[in-house]
């Protein structure tokens, strides 16, 4: 049923005249395999930390501020961000390896040297990838909702993740959260605000995406008139 709904939504989008803001991003190249929509991050195969890459080989200008996108999906959002903000470095972390491989292939096609995608379970690997103060900005957008209560422990924003980000983010750095599921968005915010190092300067949700570049799920929601719940938090 979910697949039928997604196909219907995609068909509706393709009939529209609006053009998604991924100009220059290859949209048709397939994975060559069937991809699981959801991956259980608690499975044994995802419990080993991913070692950090040789950062000097990843980024041409290593000293630029680093934006971490957690759950980067297909990577189109981050590829476009890298085009728009060449004075930033971008890292997308994704647990579905085929998406990571394709996103890095797209990056190479586009000739970008300020963006990289990494296959990792972020809740296991985060503290192994960075040193305190390495991160300047974090986005977590439309994470898997894991609706069943017994599956909530699979959700990406857990207390351990928040504590690690508090250590790794520079003071004053933003954390941008969004979801089309109100309960998921509010839970993410609550988890961050339970930690004394994070606060909400807006005292509630915000209306717009401050980056002006939507993810694919966000674009779908906008075209279909579905609500999106957005929050901009900051590291104290």
Curated annotation (Swiss-Prot):
GO molecular function: tRNA (guanine(46)-N7)-methyltransferase activity
DNA-binding found in the keyword field: no
Keyword terms of this UniProt record: Methyltransferase, S-adenosyl-L-methionine, Transferase, tRNA processing
Catalysed reactions, semicolon-separated: guanosine(46) in tRNA + S-adenosyl-L-methionine = N(7)-methylguanosine(46) in tRNA + S-adenosyl-L-homocysteine
Root EC class: transferase
Annotated binding of S-adenosyl-L-methionine, by residue: 69, 94, 121, 144
The keyword Methyltransferase is assigned to this record: yes
Ligand binding (substrate): 148, 180
Record-listed E.C. numbers: 2.1.1.33
InterPro entries per the UniProt record, alphabetical: SAM-dependent_MTases_sf, tRNA_(Gua-N-7)_MeTrfase_Trmb, tRNA_methyltr_TrmB_bact
Signal sequence residues: none
Family of the protein in this entry: Belongs to the class I-like SAM-binding methyltransferase superfamily. TrmB family.
UniProt-recorded name of the protein: tRNA (guanine-N(7)-)-methyltransferase
Organism of this sequence: Synechococcus sp. (strain JA-3-3Ab) (Cyanobacteria bacterium Yellowstone A-Prime)
Phylogenetic placement of the source organism: Bacteria, Bacillati, Cyanobacteriota, Cyanophyceae, Synechococcales
Gene assigned in the entry: trmB
